[in-house]
């Protein structure tokens, strides 16, 4: 009997020992499994945090550049400012804020610039501002822009004083301009955001695009880069204007064309940045003289040839315009409207007789 009790006790002890070992193994195994699970979860969290957050883009699209801007700014009419471009008038002020710049010859083979602005709100100095030539009015009308100038040729005065174009000039809003003492007249006339806006308010011009106005250009979509099918490389573009002798140089890193004139970089003195653009359009036009024998006029209706330059390449294009107050369309060799890369554009009017002076090279 005593012997049986010992056997039973031994068996019970063995069972208890086995149970304890089993519990330890289970506990140890569970702990190990838990650590693996935690490691997996930790790794997942680390991978998630490395994904960059996306910033919501403004909902508006610029009519001038195709880029995202605020909806309020996107529906606002641009202003077009006439820039003096002789050597006594540089450096320019505020022009780096422009989305579109037109360059065209005037008397004496010099050029003037017309800069189209959407956002000029912070600019205290814009210019120097110079006088109007009639064909610049038609450039401004293509963009439904309010045209700012100081003075005008006698051939433009009647048009400016009619209701054909909303304009801010010396004859109707002289208080919107001011003169500086660092240059001699007439190269020292400037305006500002405050001067422009107060003049527009005084003259009662509407501030939003007219109903039904559509974007002048078609632009590449976000994250899209237009690469022309042409094999013609365009790393340097000389425009052929004889006085300021401007040219652009392509920077492959940022896809921009940087501008030079008068033998040096073309700088905006308000931010000390060199002017640059994503697109260049060269439009060959016929030009004649008015009866005074010196004032230039341009034929902007009909059709003609030109160049479209972007992303390091150039292709031949044709341009068409049915009526003076209409829109100029630029067509590729297949007859389709060109698509521009997002960003600034420089549009250059070159007289047909000087077309061979335009040089596009590697």
Where are these regions (language model features)?
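N-terminal Sec-pathway targeting helices
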Residues: 2-16
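A surface/extracellular/periplasmic glyco- and lipid-processing/surface-interacting theme
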Residues: 2-4, 38-41, 46-102, 107-362
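Compositionally biased non-globular segments, especially hydrophobic aliphatic-rich helices
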Residues: 12-15, 30, 45-52
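ASCE RecA-like P-loop NTPase motor cores
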Residues: 19-21
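Hydrophobic single-pass membrane-insertion segments
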Residues: 23-36
């Amino acid at each position: 009997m005593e012997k049986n009790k010992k056997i039973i006790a031994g068996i019970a002890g063995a069972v208890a020992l086995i149970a304890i070992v089993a519990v330890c193994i289970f506990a140890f195994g569970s702990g190990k499994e838990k650590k693996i699970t935690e490691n997996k979860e930790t790794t997942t969290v680390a991978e998630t945090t490395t994904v960059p957050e996306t910033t919501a883009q403004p909902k508006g699209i610029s009519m001038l550049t195709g880029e995202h801007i605020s909806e309020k700014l996107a529906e606002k009419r641009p202003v077009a400012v006439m820039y003096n471009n002789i050597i006594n008038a540089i450096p320019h002020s505020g022009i780096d804020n422009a989305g579109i710049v037109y360059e065209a010859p005037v008397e004496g083979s010099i050029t003037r610039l017309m800069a189209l602005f959407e956002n000029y709100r912070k600019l205290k100095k814009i210019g120097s501002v110079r006088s109007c030539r009639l064909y610049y009015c038609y450039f401004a009308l293509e963009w439904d822009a309010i045209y700012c100038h100081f003075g005008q040729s006698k051939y433009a005065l009647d048009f400016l004083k009619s209701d054909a174009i909303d304009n801010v000039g010396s004859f109707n809003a002289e208080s919107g301009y001011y003169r500086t003492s660092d240059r001699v007249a007439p190269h020292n006339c400037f305006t500002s955001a405050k001067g422009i806006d107060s003049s527009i308010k005084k003259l009662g011009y509407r501030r939003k695009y007219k109903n039904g106005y559509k974007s002048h250009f078609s632009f590449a979509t976000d994250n899209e880069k237009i690469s022309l099918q042409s094999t013609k490389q365009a790393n340097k573009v000389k425009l052929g204007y004889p006085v300021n002798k401007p040219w652009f140089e392509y920077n492959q890193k940022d896809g921009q064309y940087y501008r030079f004139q008068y033998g040096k970089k073309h700088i905006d003195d308000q931010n000390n940045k060199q002017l640059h653009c994503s697109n260049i359009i060269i439009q060959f036009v016929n030009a004649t003289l008015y009866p005074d024998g010196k004032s230039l006029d341009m034929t902007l209706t009909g059709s003609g040839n030109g160049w479209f330059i972007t992303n390091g390449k150039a292709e031949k294009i044709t341009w068409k315009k049915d009526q003076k107050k209409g829109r100029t369309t630029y067509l590729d060799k297949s007859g389709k409207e060109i698509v521009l890369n997002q960003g600034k554009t420089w549009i250059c009017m070159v007289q047909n007789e000087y077309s061979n002076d335009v040089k596009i090279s590697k």
